[in-house]
Amino acid sequence: MNSDNDLQIAGDILEVPHLLQPPREHPVTVAEFAGLARAIAADRAQWEHLVRYDATTRWYHRLRTGPGYEVWLLSWVPGQGSGSHDHGRSSGVLTVLEGTLTEHTGRATRALSAGAQRVFAPGYVHEVVNDALEPAVSLHVYYPGLTEMPMHTAQSCEARPVTA
């Protein structure tokens, strides 16, 4: 009969905290960037008073910067869209704060309502559009900070049949 118990196998759980790393001041992993976006989204006092709507162009505001990342706030009136684009060498997290946005990619079309979050890697081509009847607001975290946004033809976001 084995006399080992869980405490002997795993060690005393109360001794583990000294092994944990202290929380980082700035995010460095995809999960931490997504968490940053969720935290900002949940704290309306950080962004709600800044939002503006512009019928002639998409409004945007750089909300925060940190080592190797930027956080942007964007508003979208009905009918406004980004055009088909990627984010160069940047990865990103898109979080819808208010309203509904539609994301078109080469594989799918997704309705993103408030609280929805999309994470993407460099080279991810998409188009984001407000095709609803109400304005929308979104939060974008780019890491590293956004230095380019190459535009693509509309066909790069259309679903195409698979050929052998």
What does each model-found stretch correspond to?
Residues 93, 105-125:
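Short acidic-glycine-tyrosine-enriched beta hairpin
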Residues 1-44:
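N-terminal leader/capping segments at the start of a protein or of a new domain
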Residues 72-87, 121-123:
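Conserved short histidine dyad/triad with adjacent acidic residue
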Residues 93, 133-149:
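A short hydrophobic beta-strand segment most commonly corresponding to one strand
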Residues 128-132:
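Asparagine-centered strand-capping/turn motif at beta-strand->loop junctions
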Residues 78, 89-104:
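Glycine- and acidic-residue-biased ligand/ion/polar-headgroup-sensing regions
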Residues 144-164:
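Extended, aromatic/histidine-rich regions of cofactor-dependent oxidoreductases associated
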Residues 49-80:
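A short glycine-rich, His/Asp/Glu-containing loop-to-beta-strand
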